[in-house]
Amino acid sequence: MRRKAVLLTVVLSLSGGSAQAMGLLDAWELALRNDAQLRAAGFERDAGQEEVAIGRAGLLPSLQYTYGANYSHSKVTQRDRTLNNTTKRDYDNYVSTLTLRQPLLDYAAWARYQQGVTRKLMADQRFRDRSQDLMVRLYQSWSEALLAQEKLMLLDAQRRAYQEQLALNRRLLAAGEGTQTDLRETEARYTVTEAQRIEQEDTLDAAMTDLENMMGSPLQIQDLSPLALDTLPDNVTENRSLSQWRELTVRHNAKLAVQRENVDYSRYEIERNRAGHLPTLDLVASTRNSLSESEYNYNQKYDTQTVGLQVRVPLYSGGAVSASMRQAAAEYQQSQAELDNQTRQTFAELRRQFNLCANGAAKIRAWQMSVAAAEEAIRATRQSVAGGERINLDVLMAEQEWYNARRELTEVKYRWLQAWLNLRYTAGTLNEQDMMQLAAWFQSAPVINKTGINAATGNKTN
């Protein structure tokens, strides 16, 4: 029922009229259904489920039926001392065989079965990784779009301020109180702002395109619920030390789990090749019907049932088995080295994200103070210009510092949320509850359709 309500809300928010911003959870629900990368991972997982059955088949009985029918024409000559007797034969013959084979001792088949189990587990872990990665990719594109929009708003405000400054410079120049230098400095700043605005428009378009691809629906920036996080919550690292997060990572990180299964797969590959030196033992049972199978049993019908054991002992294969074992052993060492490398990289990324989370609150407070100080600097600089103590360039630089501080404050909030998400993704514990917590830090206005009905509650709005 919750998913149906979410989808109804999303559909109404994407339709025309006065629909308001959708929430991050709504977007996630759509992405779960429509993201091509996740769907591909789902098919890969489904294919991986069959690896166990394929490997198990080598340990189970096999039943085979063969039938052959022919028409034969032969000439039989019998010699005695005085003459040759020739007889012509035209006849039908057939052979029908049903064979049951049950492996009793087949080390290669056992190794292939174990490899099938590891491949199935690898497919499961890859799908879990893609599911968690979808949350990360969705937030990344979501935050990039909102951040680009906020930067555009700041650039628009900055552009308006420069336009006002240009108008003031022109009035002062016309009155003989200004200079061409002041005018050109302001024009240069205004031109740079225009270029930065174009760059942010491109960034916004790219982020919105990524969101549309994930969600499978067209979007406008107005559809996205904005960030509503002024101060960071307490306990951002869940009272866990870095070493505790490392322990979680070893147990739950999907990429490490895939690599460990790959090591096991390589180990069983060694055993599979070792089987080339070992005998196999099969139980074989068959029933065979034949008529005139050859000239020696012409016009004779046989019904034969047999049960027995069949042993195959490899003696020599030109050195291929030994070479294959050496190759598999080298690949096993390679997989272990890749696991070590993946573990080190994962721990390094975990430390980076942990530090970003732990230091996020201090960074946000510092940039909030920087914004407040920049606002005071603008007011003081303008008063000094009016008193003749400062020049036009000082005002432009003070305004630039304020816009830079505002931009950094906005970016550090989004970066902290990204680190909060990445910390749990790297540890392998990222789940739906984390996504719900993340969505709670974004404002999500109720969706109002064209009839004035709140899509979430069903109540009439005034």
Swiss-Prot record:
Keyword Signal included in the entry's annotation: yes
GO terms for MF: efflux transmembrane transporter activity; porin activity
Main location group: membrane
Highest taxon of source: Bacteria
Protein location: Cell outer membrane
Pfam families cross-referenced by the UniProt entry: OEP
NCBIfam families linked to this entry: type_I_sec_TolC (TIGR01844)
Biological function: Involved in the secretion of proteases A, B, C and G.
Protein name: Proteases secretion protein PrtF
